[in-house]
A protein has these predicted regions:
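Catalytic core of DAGKc-family lipid kinases
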Residues: 31, 79-83, 87-228
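Short Gly/Thr/Asp-enriched flexible loops that form oxyanion-binding sites at enzyme active sites
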Residues: 69-82
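ATP/nucleoside-binding phosphotransfer catalytic cores, i.e., glycine-rich phosphate-binding loops
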Residues: 17, 215-222, 242-348
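Glycine-rich beta-alpha junction loops
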Residues: 10, 134-136, 169-173, 233-235, ...
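Glycine-rich beta-strand-to-loop/alpha-helix junction loops that act as flexible
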Residues: 10, 64-66, 87-91
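ATP/NTP phosphate-donor binding region
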Residues: 1-61, 71, 113-117, 346-348
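Glycine-rich phosphate/pyrophosphate-binding beta-alpha loops
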Residues: 170, 174, 228-244, 322
Length: 348
């Protein structure tokens, strides 16, 4: 009987993950798996558990949760030959979506059996990841300081922190929204309405500031950072927003979206097109291209790129967590992890 190790975040979706796990577990056993469950207890715990399992005899290590849990488990397995499976019961589930795995609809999971079937007979794909380095974001009374994980490797610059991205890296209005959410702003509002309220607050509170960007081996350029940028290996993030339309995990590079110099009205107006994937080219200010390396810095008083962080702080999301700030660097590395997904995946 094949053994499967499942790593569950019991706090995902305010505890709904535990209830849905109660449906998944018997389905896994019925499929012929010997199930071993590991519950996480604190941020980064899933990475530690996954790393300890990376050389074990389990057929597959399964992340049970959303994109945050997937990120932690993938970080722990990265560089090994152990296969990562996904049972998506978080709020975003974009990495599962990119691998053709069925996802929940609200609080219901109509094709839960389909997700289990992929664990049994899905296709294993070897994919890359981005190494991301920058200063760690400072904590908040409701957010602990991000911690260094030895499995991520050491930074090249003293005081920096390293994370690996399997889904996407973004900054701008999107990371400001995520940071405010984590700080507990509008916590009495639930669902998509909360993100709408956070987005409006972030946009109207946005202060224009320049930024310097260097893509691959091209000369650096200065932009007005009113908007966002996103380096992604998948088509969607934020729970289905098609931010980098056409991207897929086995493409062998990142898809870089840049939306700079937007007015506050344009930032509000772009949210609908972002969800549908019809935003590229709008107002002549939104572009998308392939890239494998990116540097982002503030601009000093002399008009040159600076080693200082932006002021006010520009947070950088790595797979949905606002853990870093500028100056930031990222580089794509091939052959980092094996993912079990559907026989065919979107855009491949």
């Amino acid at each position: 009987m094949p053994r499967v190790a499942c790593i569950l975040n019991p706090n995902a979706r305010d505890g709904l993950s535990v209830k849905q796990w109660g449906q998944f577990e018997p389905a896994l056993r019925l499929a012929g798996f010997e199930v071993e469950l590991h519950n996480t207890q604190y941020p980064g715990h899933a990475t530690e558990i996954a790393h300890s399992l990376s050389s074990g005899d389990h057929e597959i290590v399964v992340a049970v949760g959303g994109d945050g849990t997937v990120h932690e488990v993938a970080s722990g397995l990265r560089g090994s030959n152990k296969v990562l499976g996904i049972l998506p019961i978080g709020s975003g589930n974009d990495y599962a979506r990119a691998h053709g795995i069925p996802t929940p609809k609200g609080n219901k999971f109509p094709d839960m059996q389909g997700a289990v079937d992929i664990l049994v007979s899905g296709v294993d794909r070897r994919v890359g990841a981005f190494r991301v380095e920058g200063p760690p974001a400072k904590g908040h009374k409701s957010i602990p300081d991000p911690e260094h994980h030895s499995v991520d490797g050491e930074p090249e610059v003293s005081g920096n922190m390293v994370r690996w991205s399997f889904l996407e890296i973004d900054s701008g209005v999107t990371s400001a929204v995520n940071r405010m959410k984590n700080e507990g702003k509008f916590k009495w509002i639930r669902g998509q309405l909360k993100y709408t309220a956070l987005g409006i607050r972030a946009i109207f509170g946005w202060r224009n500031q320049p930024g310097w960007i260097k893509i691959d081996d091209e000369p650096g350029q200065i932009f007005n950072f009113s908007g966002l940028f996103c380096m992604s290996q998948c088509q969607t993030f934020g729970g289905g927003f098609k931010v980098t339309p056409g991207a897929y995990p086995t493409q062998g590079h990142g898809s870089l979206l840049m939306a700079f110099g937007l007015s506050k009205l344009q930032m509000l107006m772009v949210m609908g097109p972002l969800e549908k994937g019809t935003h590229v080219g709008k107002w002549g200010k939104i572009s998308m291209r392939n890239a494998t390396r990116l540097e982002v810095r503030a601009v000093g008083g002399d008009g040159e790129p600076s080693n200082d962080s932006h002021n006010p702080t520009m947070f950088v999301n790595v797979d949905g967590e606002a853990v870093l700030t500028t100056p930031i660097s990222m580089a794509y590395h091939e052959d980092q992890i094996s993912i079990r997904g559907a026989a065919s995946i979107p855009n491949e």
